UniProtKB/Swiss-Prot annotation:
Residues 309-586, 606-936 form the ABC transporter domain. GO terms for cellular component: cytoplasm; excinuclease repair complex. Belongs to the ABC transporter superfamily. UvrA family. ATP binds at residues 31-38, 639-646. NCBIfam families: PRK00349.1, uvra. Gene3D superfamilies: ABC transporter ATPase domain-like (1.10.8.280), ABC transporter ATPase like domain (1.20.1580.10), ATP-grasp fold, A domain (3.30.1490.20), P-loop containing nucleotide triphosphate hydrolases (3.40.50.300). A zinc finger (C4-type) spans 252-279, 739-765. GO terms for molecular function: ATP binding; ATP hydrolysis activity; DNA binding; excinuclease ABC activity; zinc ion binding. It comes from Vibrio vulnificus (strain CMCP6). The UvrABC repair system catalyzes the recognition and processing of DNA lesions. UvrA is an ATPase and a DNA-binding protein. A damage recognition complex composed of 2 UvrA and 2 UvrB subunits scans DNA for abnormalities. When the presence of a lesion has been verified by UvrB, the UvrA molecules dissociate. This is UvrABC system protein A.
Length: 940
């Protein structure tokens, strides 16, 4: 069977569509945001492919797998088992790293366990048990005629006179010993000082190196090893030549340090055998950070320099009063004027010094108690450790920072694992390399003999996996990078690389915009990877808006014509040529150039006197970057993946602005020297792709603030007033108006164990969330439930006479969200949709013209036509005097910017510098900028 037949697909907004999709081809599904692409790719094809495979398993196995809901479709045939690679499922497990997700780390553990060389942490001597034959051979390799003596260490760095030891050695027939580095006669040994440490080594044999000494040396070594418990030393009899220490034990000959046999689990930070005991393999330690605990060092303790310990908190302030009396300091003096020692006592405690504390209870009785002062940081730590209250924990988390573990230095591994080497390189050193550097290391790694044979297969697996990661544009990441810190696009491409590593055949892969966060330069490699997956014999379905991906596809499906209720139909399908020739295809019109996003004829000029200057940003891979952002312009931050854009803008620039303009207390900017020019703004707004809410109770109406005036309208109707209903009656989050059977959720979750959890509409309210009495109240003929079911477009028409609601709905339409429902659960919105809901909320607020907006890849999930709408909105914000800073790879956005700041030249350690800045026309001329190379043709 060479095709997949879909008949009557009605999932979500799909309108009973029929499709024939070729198998073993690269298929791109494109169309407007919200047109139904994901409904077709993920909720129909993937869901059915995965469901059929899981259903073939036993009931016992099924209970461990989440079975997907059966899609609303009449018939699908020709499906393979399906694997989806989405952006959403970025791991939040602090133990997941790039190395563990891709399994490279598992192979590295195996490699180090099998061919690694353990060394003593203190003396850096290889730990290797040697046979007597090996010891003899080593001595015979010395220059012929060299005079050597064989020593057996008897006492090592121990105090005492050791008279008995020396007598015993003489009684056994030994003539000489080396005591504290000096050779002496045992018939007349020196008197040793009782309280000094001494080392005694008995001379077992003295030889001139010759080839016929094998037997004699072997016997002498046997004697020496027996005397010393496994250690022997060969030392020159004359001069200061090098000594050779031999060990018959798997231990350091100098200090006796030994370790168990090497096993892969010793190198796992997720296993007690390998994890650092201090941080349990997390690599970081949490601590209460004085910088977060001290709210404002310019205030006094009485005024609230430390929140919760001011005059308002009577119990804690009593303690500080007693402390101030004891140490004679002023509670009304600014905290930063107190001496360092006093500040230390307040934060870390008085140690063993007891202080007389005066406690006054509610009745006014005074009680005196003597005890040391615990210290504010220790008090917070104890409360955090002992509390069972989530709210207290959440409050205290604000004051916690993390730092690299003091024991393992952030490597996550115990001492033994950190001291195993392959060619002078440890495992922690390898995982700190970028993937590109790690690939070079293993490509040039030379092992010899048996070790080379053992390592051959493991090295091939490591090299293959590293190469796949390079192919999907992730050469700048390092293997120790925590999965939590990856962007959606990076996480998706890592899973893509893992799948290629698996080398499966006959599978249907479904991908969701794998080009997110990729620079045009890396896009080509990604497309080669996708075609490689196809060439292995797989069907590759990609939901994508990227022009290169659409042109590269064997088969294109264009869903539309509009979004939401106006979409859900197949507008065009076939080869690239067929799409271009189809007059109904909006995608085809943009690809053929019939429609295009126009380059502005005139750029907004920059005022050199109005800029924000950030000096010396050095977080992650940034190399003391000086950033200059023009005020009142639309600026684009560009650069290849991993060049430092997010570190510079999100982790440094935004966090500084958030702290200084919005008064944030817990934002910790990456390191920088200084910033000036923030006085041009009154607030900063970061519009990212995180969900607008994590429960079905959050929806666009509640998030944008439309729901409050809607509830007020309903409570103002004649019916509501006669019944005494207030706006709270129309909330599904509080008792009163909501249906209590489902607590306002509209659905009831039924756990089915080895079947998927079933969400059934509530029997009582039939999924409407409200009780019957509330639903009897109508505004213009509609109940509150019917209003929540309206699309933004319908609601805009319905509420046109109500300016406060109509204005907010208009902004949702302006950002291209006319198709979403007011009450649509936040959990069903894509990252791009969530970002645009946030943008709409900000647009609907009163505009001061002094706002700094920061957006990270706002074109994610957007079709060419949606991008046109988004740009209209962003340009409107700029025209009102606001400053818009956008991190973006999309050339249609970059070419319309007023100002470009390009980072690079490469990703990871090869990046972290500003290599070009200016208008798009200026930047396009700059040699050495990858962005310039792709931007130049767009400006013609």
């Amino acid at each position: 069977m060479d095709k997949i037949e879909v008949r009557g697909a009605r999932t979500h907004n799909l309108k009973n569509i029929n499709l024939t999709i070729p198998r073993d081809k690269l298929i791109v599904i494109t169309g407007l945001s919200g047109s139904g692409k994901s409904s077709l790719a993920f909720d129909t094809l993937y869901a059915e492919g995965q469901r059929r495979y899981v259903e073939s398993l036993s009931a016992y196995a099924r209970q461990f797998l989440s079975l997907m809901e059966k899609p609303d479709v009449d018939h699908i045939e020709g499906l393979s088992p399906a694997i989806s690679i989405e952006q959403k499922s970025t791991s939040h497990n602090p133990r997941s790293t790039v190395g563990t997700i891709t399994e490279v780390y598992d192979y590295l553990r195996l490699l180090y366990a099998r061919v690694g060389e353990p060394r003593c942490p203190e003396h850096q001597v290889p730990l290797a048990a040697q046979t007597i034959s090996q010891m003899v051979d080593k001595v015979l390799e010395l220059p012929e005629g060299a005079k050597m003596m064989l020593l057996a260490p008897i006492v090592k760095e121990r105090k005492g006179e050791h008279v008995k030891t020396l007598e015993n050695l003489a009684a056994q027939g030994f003539i000489r010993a080396r005591i504290d580095g000096e050779t002496c006669d045992l018939t007349d040994p020196p008197t040793l000082e009782l309280h000094k440490k001494h080392t005694i080594e008995v001379v077992v044999d003295r030889v001139k190196v010759r080839g016929d000494l094998q037997q004699r040396l072997a016997e002498s070594f046997e004697t020496a090893l027996e005397l010393s418990g496994g250690i022997a030393v060969i030392a020159p009899m004359e001069g200061d030549g090098e000594e050779i220490v031999f060990s018959a034990n798997f231990a350091c000959p100098h200090c006796g340090y030994s370790m168990q046999e090497l096993e892969p689990r010793l190198f796992s930070f997720n296993n007690p055998a390998g994890a650092c005991g201090t941080c349990d393999g997390l690599g970081v330690q949490q601590y209460f950070d004085p910088e977060r605990v001290i709210q404002d060092a310019n205030l006094s303790l009485a005024q609230g320099a430390i929140r919760g310990w001011d005059q308002k908190n009577y119990y804690y302030f009593q303690m500080l009063t007693s402390l101030a009396e004891h140490y004679d300091f002023d509670l009304h003096a600014p905290f930063n004027s107190l001496s360092k020692r006093i500040q230390e006592v307040i934060l870390k405690g008085s140690g063993r010094t007891e202080i007389e504390f005066k406690y006054i209870n509610d009745r006014g009785d005074i009680r005196l108690k003597r005890h040391p002062f615990e210290g504010i940081l220790n008090t917070l730590e104890r409360r955090y450790r002992d509390t069972e209250s989530n709210s207290v924990r959440e409050e205290l988390v604000k004051y916690i920072s993390t730092k690299p573990c003091t024991s393992c230095g952030g490597t996550r591994l115990r001492l033994e694992a950190r001291n195993v080497f392959i060619n002078d390189t440890t495992l922690p050193q390898i995982v700190e390399l970028s993937i590109a550097d790690a690939l070079t290391f293993f490509a040039t790694l030379k092992l010899e003999g048996q070790r080379a044979q053992i390592a051959e297969k493991v090295m091939k697996e490591i090299n293959d996996r590293l190469q796949f990661l390079v192919n999907v544009g992730l050469n700048y990441l390092n293997l120790s990078r925590s999965a939590e810190t990856l962007s959606g696009g990076e996480a998706q491409r890592i899973r893509l690389a893992s799948q290629i590593g698996a080398g499966l055949v006959g599978v249907m892969y479904v991908l969701d915009e794998p080009s997110i966060g990729l620079h045009q330069r890396d896009n080509e490699r990604l497309l080669k990877t996708l075609t490689h997956l196809r060439d292995l014999g797989n069907t590759v379905l990609v939901v994508e808006h990227d022009e290169d991906a659409i042109r590269c596809a064997d088969h294109v499906i264009d869903i539309g014509p509009g979004a939401g209720v106006h979409g859900g139909q197949v507008v065009a399908e076939g080869t690239m040529a067929e799409i271009l020739a189809n007059p109904d295809s909006l995608t085809g019109q943009y690809l053929s150039g019939a429609k295009q996003i126009i380059v502005p004829t005139q750029r907004t000029p920059r005022d050199k006197n109005k800029t924000v200057e950030l000096i010396g940003a050095s977080g992650n891979n940034l190399k003391e970057v000086n950033l200059s952002v023009p005020v009142g312009l639309f600026s684009c931050i560009t650069g290849v993946s991993g060049s430092g854009k997010s570190t510079l803008i999100n982790d440094t620039f935004f966090k500084i602005a958030h702290t200084q303009l919005n008064g944030a207390t817990t934002a910790q900017p990456a390191p920088y020297k200084s910033i000036k020019g923030l006085e041009h703004f009154d607030k900063v707004i970061d519009i990212d792709q995180s969900p607008i809410g994590r429960t079905p109770r959050s929806n666009p109406a509640t998030y944008t603030g439309i729901f409050t005036p809607i509830r007020e309208l309903f409570s103002g109707t004649q019916e509501s007033r006669s019944r005494g209903y207030k706006p709270g009656r129309f909330s599904f989050n509080v008792r009163g108006g909501r249906c209590e059977a489902c607590q306002g959720d509209g659905v009831i979750k039924v756990e089915m164990h080895f079947l998927p959890d079933v969400y059934v509409p509530c029997d009582v309210c039939k999924g409407k969330r409200y009780n019957r009495e509330t639903l009897e109240v109508h505004y213009k003929g509609k109940s509150i439930d019917e209003v929540l079911e309206m699309t933004v477009e319908d609601a805009h028409e319905f509420f046109a006479p109500v300016p406060v609601i109509a204005r907010k709905l208009q902004t949702l339409m302006d950002v291209g969200l006319s198709y979403i429902r007011l009450g649509q659960a936040a959990t069903t919105l894509s990252g791009g949709e969530a970002q645009r809901v946030k943008l709409a909320r900000e647009l609907s607020k009163r505009d001061t013209g002094k706002t700094l907006y920061i957006l990270d890849e706002p074109t994610t999930g957007l079709h060419f036509h949606d991008i046109q709408q988004l740009l209209t909105v962003l340009h409107r914000l700029r025209d009102h005097g606001n400053t818009v800073v956008v991190i973006e790879h999309n050339l249609d956005v970059i070419k319309t910017a007023d100002w470009i700041i390009d980072l690079g030249p490469e990703g990871g350690q090869g990046g972290g510098e500003i290599i070009a800045q200016g208008t798009p026309e200026d930047v396009a001329q700059i040699e050495g900028s990858h962005t310039a190379r792709f931007l130049k043709p767009m400006l013609k």
